[in-house]
Design a protein with these regions (language model features):
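Core alpha/beta nucleotide-donor-binding catalytic domains of modification enzymes
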Residues: 1-237
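AMP-forming adenylation/ATP pyrophosphatase catalytic core
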Residues: 3-12, 17-34, 55, 90, ...
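Residue-level recognition of short, well-ordered coil/turn positions
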Residues: 48-51, 240, 333, 420
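Alpha-helix N-capping/helix-start residues
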Residues: 68, 198-199, 242, 288, ...
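A general alpha-helix detector
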Residues: 133, 227-231, 247-248, 302, ...
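Internal, active-site/partner-interface "lid" segment
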Residues: 218-222, 243-253
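Inter-helical turn/loop segments and adjacent helix faces that build the functional surface
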Residues: 235-245
Length: 448
């Protein structure tokens, strides 16, 4: 019996990941490269069978002169296939790491464009899994970093930055349906090609006489992934190929799931959200004695998840500084990491937002306006939502009993009318429900 072809494998993958009741509309992120163009053709054939409407999006990062023409190539292919297509343009502001900024910008743009669509297909392949495994192995990653990328992953991009695209930049026919009133924020990345090899997808495209673009940066040894790709080719000659590495990463994913289950159990017993004056502070309190009694791996997982939860960061902190912070915490000290601060206070460890990371951030309050990735004041239009800071702290003459100490209170969310403090519910200023906490998804499945 012959092996199933790419279309049959894609249908099986989609059935496993999203079936049997498929959504009526699904988005595809298509760059124009071989992997994503193969996914477009595979999804086209699959969608015609299952009656699913596809919405295709390309993010033009503007980093190469050819990028606009490549996006137009994708748009032309979509027109020929009969699917709506939108090009979203991202421009780097020069701040931070370029690749990280491009990734975050891409997700934020897609999130604003997707409307009510809940699923976006991405074209990561088995080669991507193997290359990522080798890259992280070279950095000394543990189970967390070496585990295979998830076939489904919930994403909730930061929404406190100014909108990077205007509605009129997207043609009406390329705008997906609007979200419903009960739709939760964020979307799911779905990766149906993790079992496919890059070379097989290009063979599929050649058979179809399909078009794709080879990004010249894929041959630039200045990029770590390009060097890793060449290393993988040499390893395959010695019998250590992408299939073996991807299978190892998948086994480590199962080990990670077991470790996460243990961390969830411990966190439920020893970690609690902090409140003051009947309002959430956005901080976490960890029982010192209970936390100290569990195994190191569980401690690290809980601490990493706590830092992610408090900072709304999409990724956990790096292993080495995380381990150093844990040692200081267990010895009664503390420190800063991942935009957070940790301090030992009596019988608890307090994990709170680092004021220095928030000092220069603010947003105009109002419905749908999120500050620091998790705070909203829908009924306070016209006011500014920002950190309390030393200036706001000084305006509160009587500090309530049991309130967070000054070093933590400076990072509390507050509403201002220019320089005048209007509300800081966690310190008894204004109504307790003046601000609402919309925490991100549970990091590593550990809910607080």
């Amino acid at each position: 019996m012959s092996e199933p072809g790419p279309d049959a494998r894609f249908a099986a993958s989609m059935g496993t990941l999203m079936g049997p009741e498929f959504p009526s509309d699904i988005a595809l992120a298509v760059s124009g490269g071989g992997d994503s163009m193969a996914m477009l053709y595979l999804a086209h054939n699959w969608a015609r069978v299952w009656g699913v409407r596809l919405w295709v999006v390309t993010v033009d990062h503007g980093l190469r002169p050819e990028s606009a023409a490549e996006a137009e190539m994708v748009a032309g292919t979509c027109r020929a296939l009969g699917w709506p297509h939108a090009t979203l343009r991202w421009r780097w502001d020069g701040a931070g790491n370029l690749q990280d900024a491009a990734r975050r910008g891409r997700l934020a743009l897609i999130d604003r464009w997707r409307g009510g669509l809940r699923h976006v297909l991405f074209a990561h392949t088995m080669d991507d899994v193997a290359e990522t495994f080798l890259m992280r192995l070279s950095r000394g990653s543990g189970v967390e970093g070496l585990s295979a990328m998830a076939a489904r992953r919930a994403v909730r991009p930061h929404m406190d930055a100014p909108p990077p695209l205007a509605p009129d930049e997207i043609a009406t026919e390329a705008r997906p349906p609007a979200p419903g009133p009960d739709d939760a924020p964020g979307f799911e990345i779905v990766r149906p090609l993790l079992g496919e090899r890059r070379e097989d997808l290009r063979f599929y495209l050649r058979v179809l006489k399909g078009r794709w673009i080879e990004d010249p940066s894929n041959e630039d040894p200045g990029f770590e992934r390009v060097r890793t790709r060449r290393l993988l080719a040499r390893l395959e000659e010695e019998g250590l190929g992408a299939e073996t590495l991807a299978a190892t990463a998948d086994r480590l994913s199962r080990a990670r799931a077991a470790l996460e289950a243990r961390a969830r159990e411990v966190a439920a017993r020893f970690v609690a959200r902090a409140e003051s004056c009947g309002a959430p502070t956005g901080e976490l309190l960890i029982d010192r004695d209970g936390f100290a009694a569990v195994e190191t791996d569980t401690q690290l997982r809980i601490l990493a998840a706590a830092l992610q939860w408090v900072s709304s960061a999409p990724y956990r902190p790096r292993a080495r500084p995380l381990e150093a912070l844990l040692v200081r915490a267990l010895s009664g000290g503390g420190g800063t990491l991942h935009g957070c601060e940790l301090r030992a206070e009596g019988e608890v460890l307090r994990v709170f937002r680092e004021y220095a990371a928030l000092r220069d951030t603010s947003t105009r309050a109002g419905p749908g306006r999120i500050w620091d990735g998790r705070w909203e004041a829908p009924g306070a239009e016209g006011l500014t939502l920002r950190a309390l800071g030393p200036d706001g702290w000084a305006q509160i003459a009587q500090k309530p009993a049991g309130a967070p100490p000054a070093h933590a209170a400076h990072a509390l969310p507050a509403l201002f009318d220019h320089a005048r403090l209007v509300a800081c519910p966690a310190l008894g200023q204004g109504r307790p429900d003046a601000l609402s906490l919309r925490p991100p998804r549970a990091p590593a499945g550990i809910g607080f």
